[in-house]
């Protein structure tokens, strides 16, 4: 409906340009917002205020001209001018009912899918395989996963890329430690990667002989030595298995097939350097090969270097990222490359994207976007740590989430068996961790708070999961009793109308999530939907409604609410429960 209204306004502006009211060559950006005050209608625009100066007109008079120029239509029931020139629009009930019916009759809830499907390559998670995944890896994995699900739902081809770190000097240290252990000990110690890494690091720091051996093994590994590759493959296999366990528990759709590791680009890196040389972009600086871009300068005004090859011949992240960009466009056919990486890498990606275009690693109008995110903080305002002050392993965090959720459920009266309680606790616990993150603005830091995320009140996973079971319970009680699914929808009560207005926003919100890569818009929508359904449920009898037409209508509204909640949570990677 938002798109329809934008089209009507575009036609009105076109008419005013033709009349000379607005300069014909003036570019107009039509922006519609949702008013917080429901008395101001369903949509509002400040278009008249923005165009008043170029039109040399009083904003309110221009607003009147815009309203008069809107073509006759069935979309709107009312247009009002407020204050100095804001225009408020109210959607007609007939239009609302038609949209609700279309949503009920569609497996995809009548969401507008892309007319031309794009190939979107999404880089997310991408942990360093030298260690186990920790709490710092949470945001990339679940935000990237939610956005990829939404893009797929909106009709795009999504190619997931897990650009894991599996190369570099630290792997020499790990291989040297594996070599020093017998097979049985190595297998045992690899079961806890964090312990393994710490033990290897301690040996590296304390023994010069061990450190020398580690450096030798790095050189051998990078030159393709069969023995080193065997040890390395053994380590990588164990580490990837640890990652997959975490993805499976989190409900993240990444698999081994999505792994395109740093090492996969090794053979392409000499070609990257040669290509930059041919383009005349390389400069040698203290023995290293660098690119200096005028667009990025230091405090003294000097161009900042992008180092692509070290003095000793080794390559850096920048080199690998350039190779990956070229591969993702030219071999995977990406139209849009999305990167979900910590906000602290913003400058790195700005430089790499600029260089990729300048050097011709990408061609045409391909989109390159880095979507940074903030940090998970503790209550002390510092990055979240375990109780002993160390880094919290993600697997341990999920264990604690399940334990706390089980304790919460056991405090409530339930007819669930012990086994069912454990399953519900698993879903509630892990969903609470995910939702607490996804419901925050992606670009902001947030405080990790068990008490807040594991409550049945407010914008939390337990609240939404319970809201779904509450809607579902209506149909459990209805049982096999038939109701007329083709009955007219009636919106006679203000709570019915409020619920209907929220339901039809689903399409708009999903496109907002895709365009901004911001899952918190969907979380906010679902929270508002659950709240409006609760008000509707309390005020409007459903199963006990004697008027059959009203009863059928309210059952249809309830069914659509359940469908939207279920689909919305699924797009966030959160499974629903039939009972809690």
Swiss-Prot record:
EC identifiers of the protein: 6.1.1.19
Keywords, ordered alphabetically: Aminoacyl-tRNA synthetase, ATP-binding, Cytoplasm, Ligase, Nucleotide-binding, Protein biosynthesis
Record keyword ATP-binding present: yes
Catalytic reactions of this protein: tRNA(Arg) + L-arginine + ATP = L-arginyl-tRNA(Arg) + AMP + diphosphate
Motif 'HIGH' region, residue numbers: 127-137
Subunit structure: Monomer.
Protein name: Arginine--tRNA ligase
